[in-house]
Amino acid sequence: MKLRAVVLGLATLCTSTATFAGMVSTSSNLEFLAIDGQKASKSLGKAKTFTVDDTQSHQVVVRLNEIVGSGSNQSLFESNPVIVTFQGNAEDLVISAPAIRNLDSGDKFNQMPNITVKTKSGNAISAKVDVLKQEGLFPSGNVLNDLAEYNASGAAASVSKFTATTSANSMVAVPAGNAKANKGKVVVQGENVAEQQLQYWFQQADKETQTRFLNWAKSHK
């Protein structure tokens, strides 16, 4: 009897402390830009799924991409980055956005993103949704830095625990005269955001692209 009680007690303890992982995917018109403070990898972009802990809060940045218009008037609509914060679930989750058929609908989506999080069985999951405001010449390359600032602000969909993670994975701007690169990071200097982002993308490019860019810059002096 004592042995049975011990076994039952251990089973109850394990059940109460166990965590379960669910898969998160998106509707076909959404792409992941960042996941829990980390940049979404290219391989994940193709698979469009990742695993979450059902006991933790999770945060993703997504963008809606949709062909709008018809015939010769077709064009690609890309939304502003949208932050979605939600609680993990043992069941698989789907983050969805409605289809956008024209630019007017796209503008409305940018102003008030309509994004839902549901389980595979159709149950709605509470989520906080907000637009990630961006500035600069190449805003798409600055998602992690902007997200770190957002999470530090305490805004509606912010998650404070991801602030440090995001900052560590974003580019680092340093004052002029102190531009020695840190290993594993892209370090830039400049008087304004545009200059910093030009330097960032230059360092991201391969040697051939850098050479072409320098030749182009010389020809446009």
Swiss-Prot record:
InterPro entries: UPF0319. Keywords: Signal. The lineage of its organism: Bacteria, Pseudomonadati, Pseudomonadota, Gammaproteobacteria, Pasteurellales. HAMAP family: UPF0319. Residues 1-21 form the signal peptide. It holds the Pfam family DUF2057. Belongs to the UPF0319 family. It comes from Haemophilus influenzae (strain 86-028NP). The keyword Signal applies. This is UPF0319 protein NTHI1987.
